[in-house]
Amino acid sequence: MATDTERCIFRAFGQDFILNKHFHLTGKIGRGSHSLICSSTYTESNEETHVAIRKIPNAFGNKLSCKRTLRELKLLRHLRGHPNIVWLFDTDIVFYPNGALNGVYLYEELMECDLSQIIRSEQRLEDAHFQSFIYQILCALKYIHSANVLHCDLKPKNLLVNSDCQLKICNFGLSCSYSENHKVNDGFIKGYITSIWYKAPEILLNYQECTKAVDIWSTGCILAELLGRKPMFEGKDYVDHLNHILQILGTPPEETLQEIASQKVYNYIFQFGNIPGRSFESILPGANPEALELLKKMLEFDPKKRITVEDALEHPYLSMWHDIDEEFSCQKTFRFEFEHIESMAELGNEVIKEVFDFRKVVRKHPISGDSPSSSLSLEDAIPQEVVQVHPSRKVLPSYSPEFSYVSQLPSLTTTQPYQNLMGISSNSFQGVN
């Protein structure tokens, strides 16, 4: 395996971040259930370039974590290039001299904040912002779905936003396959504790046919949250969440429940009698009527009646953004063959192989044998559409920089050293591979 002859070690989140020597860790962004994310500066660029570094410390901890890591790596590589999907620049895997894993690293495009921070902020949002965000989500979904992939974990925290209102979807670790032949679908990934507020009813009811409609439901929940500045469905658990949905949408038709619910769930729902539901107009007073019409089509209880991504893109609410040139499909479908691997040793080898296969693609010179790997060439890795606003993109009011990070962290424009503010220490670290 190739080795890097020189790296630097930074301390953050109580962990060693062992990085390519051309990166300087500058701040802590967040801690997820699967990874730790920091901001960094790439020192070899002519201009100051910021990159997000995501460390997965427990990538080989168990089969679920290993598959999630592999799924993330492969999908970010496959979907790389869409303007509304976060860009993966490079990958790395670092072991200590004793052979213990330090972590798998993903060097990603650094965005200023996530959509949940914007929603929770006091900043005034206009209807044009909502339209822009939903349109960009749908453009990305059309691309993702055309690759026979379901995201399965769309929520505001997984939607990254810049001050120019550009939005990008991230976190594909819980994605699953989709086919018109439902027998070959992998179904919703079980075994993870994730937010249920954006889960479609068919997932709550353990329906076996996971379709593109699950992501449309999540997008509807996000639209409702933008309009109301708070989540529409806030269940404490699966049962409570289902109750929240029923109280707003009302009791679904009997034939719908017979198709997607077990007999036990069917009996549970009908013990309440006929729940009338509430109008979206009463829940979201003052909202654009066209937004509410689209919302109703997205939050349809029956997944077969839910609006498709193609029809949603053509909805009148999004007409000011509708541009067929931005609504393109992925040219190649994604294959989830690795999902059927059960051996931890084989899964671990697949992760290592994926890391180094990707590095060969994005680094300036191929990595081979035991020769030192080449330095990153970030300028070569970044396409024009990542660093420039699309010429047809409409201009919206910018967001203030205070939303770049969570409240206790400085923004990217601060002149104060991040490591002094956040207790990040750095030292030279030689010979770690």
Swiss-Prot record:
Set out the biological process GO terms recorded for this chain's protein. G1/S transition of mitotic cell cycle; regulation of G2/M transition of mitotic cell cycle; regulation of gene expression; signal transduction
The active site lies at 153 (proton acceptor)
**Which keywords does this Swiss-Prot/TrEMBL entry list?**
ATP-binding, Kinase, Nucleotide-binding, Serine/threonine-protein kinase, Transferase
Q: Where is the Protein kinase domain?
A: 23-318
| Catalytic activity entry | L-seryl-[protein] + ATP = O-phospho-L-seryl-[protein] + ADP + H(+); L-threonyl-[protein] + ATP = O-phospho-L-threonyl-[protein] + ADP + H(+)
Q: Say if the entry is tagged with keyword Repeat.
A: no
Residues binding ATP, per UniProt: 29-37, 55
Keyword Glycoprotein attributed: no
Q: Which GO terms describe its molecular function?
A: ATP binding; cyclin binding; cyclin-dependent protein serine/threonine kinase activity; protein serine kinase activity; protein serine/threonine kinase activity
Checking SUPFAM superfamilies in the record gives:
Protein kinase-like (PK-like) (SSF56112)
Q: What family is this? A: Belongs to the protein kinase superfamily. Ser/Thr protein kinase family.
* The protein, known as: Serine/threonine-protein kinase KDX1
Q: Which organism is it from?
A: Saccharomyces cerevisiae (strain ATCC 204508 / S288c) (Baker's yeast)
Q: Which gene encodes it?
A: KDX1
